[in-house]
Every structure is written in C-alpha cells, then in structure tokens.
C-alpha cells in the first residue's frame, strides 16, 4: 500500500495539486466571509468545501487513467454530456416534481440548468470536458492535414455545433468560452496563420455587421449590458450597471491590504459569491490578495500548458491546450467583467466562484492534465530503461 502511494506521489505533479488546493482554500475562506454579510450565501462555503474535496478525489482517480482511453471513450461521455444538454434546448422550467429541466437560475432566459431538490447542476460544464476530449482526438487524427478543406470543414462543424447548442440554451457566456476553446485548439493543432487571422477578422467584422443590421438578435438585457460597459454612468441603465459599478468601486477602494476578511467593512457587491468574487476579494484583501489570486491562476494556466508541451504525442498536447484555453478564457472574461471592460455574461472565476458542479468539473480537467503528465513521465522512464 505505502510503496504504491510513494510511487504515485513521485510521479504526480504535486505543484499543480498545491496550486489547486491553495485556490480552493482561499475560495472557501472568502465565501465564509461573504456568508457573514450577505443573505442567501450562508451555505456557499460548505458546498464549495464539499465540492472541492470531491473534486480532488476525482482528480486523483482520473490522474491514474490513460487519457488515450478517456478520449476514445467519447461515445460514452459524449452521449451522457450532450444527452443532458439537449433536453434543455426545448424544455424550459419543466417541473417533474423533484427535478426541474431547463431551469432558469438567474431569470435571464438562460435555461441551461437542472434543479434537483435544492441543488442546481449545469450540464454544459460536463459537456465542456467532453468537447475538449473529442476535439483533441479529432485534431490528433488530422495532424498535419487540418488545412485541407474537407478536414477543416469537419473540424469547424465539430466546434460550431456545440457552440450553437449552448447558445440555444441561452448561455452565451459559456458559448463564447466554447468558441474560444475551439479556436485556440484549432490554431494549436496546425491551422495556418493566414487562415487563423482571416477567420478571426471575418468573425469579428461579420458579427459586428450582423448585429448592426439586425440588433434584434440580441435580447434586451444583453444589449443593455453592452451599453453599460460603454456608458457606466448612464442613469437609464442604473439597474444594469449597479453590480458592475459596485464591483469596480470595491476593487478601487481595497487599497494595499484591503478592509479585512470577516470585518464587515467591505463595499457591498450584489451576489459577490458568484461572478464578482474577485471584486469582493480585492476589497477585503487588497492589492496583495488580488495579486496572489492572479499569480495562482496564471501559474495554473502556465503549468497546464507546460504539461501539454512536454507531452510526446499530439492527443495529450491537444487536451492540455484545450484545458489551458478553458482556464485562461474564463479568467480573462471574468476579470474583464469585474474591471468593467467586458459586459456581464455569467462567466465564473475558476476554483473561486461558488458553484459545486463547476468546481468538480474543473478538478476533473486537472485530473486529466495530471494523467497526461504522469503518462509522459512513464514514457520517459520506459525509454530510459530501453536505452
């Protein structure tokens, strides 16, 4: 038993695990502080703690799995993940007693949730993992030939169909993350620089032109959230800008060391436990605490990318690039929301924002990255023995 544990600890990336554990511990402490002052948040810390512990155990299990087998098992996890997503495209707030399908958690026509009793679950988080695994497998099979028209068309369909499904749910923030993950993985998988630049430019210009010609494509609250970033002091948008203005104020008044955890002297930020936990954290822990969080998340992103670059095969590299993209994009979008440079689109801060399903799924992603790292080390040891 003990020799197995020692061998496991020698092979596992302890630095990555420590980074994740540090994020989780800080998240639970901050949520406990929020729970003292905001109604409806008193159980967030305990749920986060349980989800983090469960996630760590699942990460340990997945780290011992062969990531090749996980990717090849796409008929299993793909059917489960998208089988949970698809009903929410058509069933909205359908209550079957204990279960509510297509639950609109925030009252913004985002029907991407299931509600079971008093708990909610977002299947798009599980679909995100399946999406990364299947796209990584697809790209590894067309390695060196991704720019051929037929291959490129099939990869684009692989990316855009899931994005469309998440958009139909009403969760445009997650759809944007899916799109970003797909583009980064495609570019890292060999898409030519000219096609990447042209596609990105065409997407931005085409999207802007489409919205200008048909503004009705945006829901009313979405259009107002964009205007709120451009004109945050507009009295007509006070109900939309209130949370972001409070968040920016909280960050600006945190000072060097902040107002202090559990002090009750922080700037009030509505629903601080969710999308705006960074603003609350910057207010109570100041610049020092905010910088520490950014360093932890940046180190985690870079470690994930480093693991992929060290992997000798395309599949492992593609998987790590996809998980890096998910982490990085969520961090950038969430920080942009908190700093009032991006509209509020419901993207949470990985490992910090309250949410049991998102925390568990993020740990599953880390477990897969650890699997890539462990298999890479095993391959190097086997090669050394052969030599």
Regions found by a protein language model. Name each.
Residues 65, 134, 208, 217, ...:
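Transmembrane alpha-helix boundary/anchor motif
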Residues 1-18, 23, 29-169, 325, ...:
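Membrane-helix boundary/helix-loop-helix interface segments in multi-pass membrane proteins
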Residues 50-55, 127-128, 283-302:
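Hydrophobic alpha-helical transmembrane segments
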Residues 175-186, 202-204, 298, 365-367:
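Hydrophobic transmembrane alpha-helices of multi-pass, membrane-embedded glycosylation machinery
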Residues 105-113, 198-292, 312-316:
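Hydrophobic, glycine- and aromatic-enriched re-entrant/interface helices and adjoining loop segments
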Residues 34, 124, 153-186, 213-216, ...:
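Helix-loop-helix junctions and helix-breaking kinks within/between transmembrane helices
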Residues 139, 176, 181-195, 265-289, ...:
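Interfacial segments of multi-pass membrane proteins
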């Amino acid at each position: 038993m003990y020799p197995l544990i020692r061998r496991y600890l020698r092979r596992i990336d302890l630095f990555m695990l420590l980074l994740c554990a540090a994020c989780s511990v800080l998240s639970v402490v901050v949520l406990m502080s929020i729970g003292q002052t905001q109604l409806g948040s008193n159980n967030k810390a305990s749920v986060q703690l349980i989800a983090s512990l469960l996630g760590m155990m699942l990460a340990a299990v997945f780290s011992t799995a062969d990531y090749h087998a996980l990717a090849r098992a796409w008929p299993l996890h793909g059917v489960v993940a998208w089988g949970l997503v698809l009903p929410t495209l058509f069933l909205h707030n359908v209550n079957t007693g204990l279960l509510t399908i297509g639950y609109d958690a925030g009252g913004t026509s985002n029907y991407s949730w299931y509600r079971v009793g008093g708990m909610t679950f977002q299947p798009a988080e599980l679909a995100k993992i399946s999406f990364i695994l299947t796209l990584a497998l697809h790209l590894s099979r067309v390695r060196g030939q991704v720019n051929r028209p037929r291959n490129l068309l099939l990869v684009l369909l692989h990316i855009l169909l899931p994005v469309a499904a998440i958009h139909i749910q009403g969760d445009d923030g997650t759809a944007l993350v899916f799109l970003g993950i797909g583009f980064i993985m495609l570019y890292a998988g060999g898409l030519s620089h000219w096609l990447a630049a042209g596609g990105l430019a065409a997407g931005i210009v085409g999207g802007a032109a489409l919205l200008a010609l048909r503004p009705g494509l945006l829901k009313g609250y979405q259009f107002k959230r964009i205007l709120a970033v451009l004109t945050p002091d507009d009295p007509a948008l006070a109900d939309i800008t209130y949370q972001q203005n409070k968040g920016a104020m909280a960050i600006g008044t945190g000072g060097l060391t902040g107002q202090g955890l559990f002090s009750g002297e922080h700037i009030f930020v509505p629903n601080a436990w969710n999308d705006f936990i960074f603003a609350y954290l910057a207010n109570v822990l100041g610049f020092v605490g905010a910088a520490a969080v950014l360093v932890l998340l940046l180190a985690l992103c870079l470690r994930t990318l480093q693991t992929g670059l060290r992997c000798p095969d395309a599949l492992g590299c593609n998987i790590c690039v996809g998980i890096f993209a998910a982490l990085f994009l969520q961090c950038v979008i969430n920080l942009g929301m908190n700093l009032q440079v991006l509209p509020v689109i419901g993207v949470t801060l990985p490992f910090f924002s309250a949410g049991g399903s998102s925390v568990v799924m993020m740990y599953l992603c880390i477990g897969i990255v650890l699997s890539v790292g462990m298999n890479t080390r095993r391959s190097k040891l086997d090669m050394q023995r052969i030599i």
